[in-house]
Amino acid sequence: VPVIAGITGEGTEVAALEAQRAVEAGASAGLLYPSHGWLRFGYQKGAPQDRYRVVYEESGLPLILFQYPDVTKATYNLETMLDISAQPGVFAMKNGVRNMRRWDTEIPVIRRERPDLQILSCHDEYLLHTAFDIDGFLVGYGNIAPELLLELLEAGKAQDYVKAKAVHDRLLPVTKAVYHRGSHMEGTVALKH
């Protein structure tokens, strides 16, 4: 089973060391989180691109671009996502922008410009909307209903809205109980209990 390590270290050099340890432990890939300081303060132009470049160059760990919600200051604009996804070692994107206007605008451009990039949705609360544009899900929901997620993914890839909607409707009570809450952290707690 491939292991995707979450690379969460604050600062680029610390993240590169964390990625090196992940390689030594047998990880197949790394999901590179933005520096947590960016959530509150934002980042300088070019800093995200530099983070991915340095972490890959120093570790050799294949990386997944992690697009944070656009309500944070750690979200990347389209240009930044295209820059990062063109870098050596970046093979996929976990997109959690949580703004369907941006999703509907940016995902087609990313598909056109980076056709080999795997696009993974992490929109647990927007599974139906994103299922038609992706290569897979990288979601906490996979711990709850993996079989139904696979059915939804297959329906989305087949562009079968009727089947996808039927799976979505089966998942909706769980989605509401876990993900339709006041904050993401409330959903995280609900997911664990």
Spans of model-derived segments:
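Active-site pocket-lining/capping segments in soluble small-molecule metabolic enzymes
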Residues: 181-193
